[in-house]
Amino acid sequence: MGGRGASSGAGRYRGGGGISASDILSTRDLISEREHNQQFVDEILTPFWDANNEYGYVAEQIQLATLKPNSNAIAYYDGSNIALNETFYNKKGLETAYAACVKSGFHPSNGKKTAAEAVMAHEIGHALTDAVGKKLGTPFIDQSATIIVNEARKQTKHKGVVQMARKISTYATSSNAEAIAEAFSDVYCNGGRAKSESKAIMNVINGYLK
């Protein structure tokens, strides 16, 4: 189960936010919060709606999750659903933290999209990797991710996948799966201005799913 981590003391995101099922205390459908916080909920849901329109199916639900206090995951994809840690269900805090990460190069720019849209797009990238895996018959997301990034690298001038991932973001170098998630977030947020390496990864994804 993968997810983004956060260092709340530093006010920014960092990698290593993977969680286990035992970290999840409860979840609820995010749409249930729309009556009370429509604008922010819609920001979070927009990438999900967009991806569903483009690919047909991405995830069953977008959820808010209550996690154990020692969990630093901001959001995660569990193989069926995408969830946002309710601790980070705060627009201002999310925007401030994400801006710091973009400035440092840890995550790609979110362009004209909001931080919430960028974070959820990242998790959708994991879901799309999973969808490709089902097409390939590969049972593990890391195995699917390796196939995807190796195909994408051939569309670039890079000699290795880490070198390619480094052009996307620092976090993209942590694993092939994170490189894909960062690439989708980059392309979703920046369109034609996204990094060429991100576009190469999405070309491969789209080749399998469209």
List each model region and its residues.
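Long, low-complexity, intrinsically disordered regions
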Residues: 1-4, 8-10
